[in-house]
Curated annotation (Swiss-Prot):
Compartment(s): Cell junction, Tight junction; Cell junction, Adherens junction
Its biological purpose: May play a role in cell-cell adhesion and epithelium development. May play an important role in cortical development, especially in the maintenance of radial glia.
Disordered: annotated span: 153-237
Record-stated family: Belongs to the CCDC85 family.
Protein name listed in UniProt: Coiled-coil domain-containing protein 85C
Organism of this sequence: Xenopus laevis
GO cellular component: adherens junction; apical junction complex; bicellular tight junction
Transmembrane helix found in the keyword field: no
Chain segments annotated as coiled-coil in the UniProt record: 26-86, 116-146
Biased composition (Low complexity): 182-194
Biased composition (Polar residues): 157-172
InterPro entries (UniProt xref): CCDC85
């Protein structure tokens, strides 16, 4: 509005010509001049206010600019941190990519090696399965053989008793018929008409079979351990079964030895009745120097001894344990013949007689087996120093 008044006054003055101004009076000119001065002062005040307003706005804008600068600086700092973090993450990504490539190569190589090893192990597994099948077949065959041998040993018509009787028959074929009651090893343990034949026939056959089994097992066990070789292909179960059989045979042999010792020490009358004097004192007096038992129950013949030994006796290293026991039994028998009166013969029962005869059968079967396996013992027995029952 002031601008409008000032413009209107300027237009009024500028529109007035000089002639008209000269015509005006002093009072009118002073009024016009003061009016113009007032208008100028108002315009100046208005301009000052406007400048203050502008300055205030400028200050506000400056404060805003400073705040924006601070925000911008913070954003720049954050941007720098993010840039550095991006660089770090990019490095990690590169490392991870490189590591993943290496792991891929390692995985492919490992898979190849594993497949090769699996193929090799599958081949070995097939071979082991084939070997296991062959071992199972061999074990079954060996078990059948062992069972057959065990049945043959424990059977009533075992080969051991037959062989022992045949060997004794061949050795003593020239001897005359023996008396029935003298403890001879006949198959019927006496004649068919003897009074104790029918009473003890079944018991004596069972005892003979057991004695034949013990004799056969003793011959098998008398071989040194390095001569007994286990076949290749026997597994632990078969070996354990064989060892159990050997242990059982040893126990039976020990029982037989204990029975013999008990009969020798506690039943002297039975021994006297069961054995007959086939040997003179002169023959038995030359035997004790050779009656030393062996350590392992087996005969080891040295080349020098076997080549230079006379035919009339058996060296110590050649005498089996059965021969030694038989000599001891015969010596006890001779002593009984000299010491015990004949009145004790009446005290023996039929059962005691059968037991004594069976013990004699066992002893002479062992002598026959030893003579069949050792030529020197066969020669010694054929020299009429020991004549067992047929």
């Amino acid at each position: 509005m002031a601008k409008h008044c000032q413009g209107a006054a300027a237009e009024d003055i500028s529109a007035v010509s000089d002639e008209e101004l000269l015509r005006w009076s002093k009072e009118e000119l002073i009024k016009r001049l003061r009016k113009v001065d007032n208008e100028k002062m108002s315009l100046m005040l208005e301009h000052g206010n406007m400048m203050k307003d502008v300055n205030r706005r400028l200050q506000l804008h400056l404060h805003e600019i400073r705040g924006l600068k601070d925000v911008n600086q913070k954003l720049q700092d954050e941007s720098q941190e993010l840039r550095e973090l991006c660089c770090f993450l990019d490095d990690d990504r590169q490392k991870g990519k490189k590591l993943s490539r290496e792991w891929q190569r390692f995985g492919r190589h490992s898979a190849t090696v594993v497949w090769k090893e699996v193929g090799t192990y599958q081949q070995k597994l097939k071979e082991l399965e084939a070997k296991q099948e062959s071992l199972v077949r061999d074990n079954l065959e060996l078990k059948e053989i062992i069972l057959m041998l065990d049945e043959e040993r424990n059977g009533p018509g075992s080969r051991s008793s037959i062989d022992s009787q045949n060997s004794l028959t061949n050795l003593n074929g020239g001897s005359g018929p023996r008396d029935v009651g003298d403890g001879s090893s006949t198959s019927s343990t006496g004649s068919a008409g003897s009074p104790d034949h029918h009473h003890h026939h079944h018991h004596i056959k069972t005892t003979e079979n057991k004695a034949g089994t013990i004799r056969k097992s003793t011959d098998d066990l008398s071989v040194p351990p390095h001569h007994r070789s286990i076949p290749n292909g026997l597994n632990d179960s078969s070996t354990t079964y064989i060892r159990q059989l050997e242990t059982r045979v040893k126990l039976l042999e020990d029982d037989n030895k204990l029975l013999s010792q008990h009969s020798t020490s506690g039943e002297l009358r039975t021994l006297r009745k069961g054995l007959s004097p086939y040997h003179s004192e002169s023959q038995l007096s030359s035997l004790p120097q050779y009656q030393e038992p062996l350590q392992n129950g087996s005969a080891r013949v040295a080349p020098e001894v076997s080549s230079t030994a006379p035919a009339g006796y058996i060296p110590v290293v050649q005498k089996p344990e059965a021969v030694v026991h038989a000599m001891k039994v015969l010596e006890v028998h001779e002593n009984l013949d000299r010491q015990i009166p004949d009145t004790y013969e009446e005290d023996l029962s039929e059962k005691e007689k059968a037991i004594v005869r069976e013990m004699c059968n066992v002893v002479w079967r062992k002598l026959g087996d030893a003579a069949n396996s050792k030529p020197s013992i066969r020669q010694h027995l054929s020299g009429n120093q020991f004549k067992g029952p047929l």
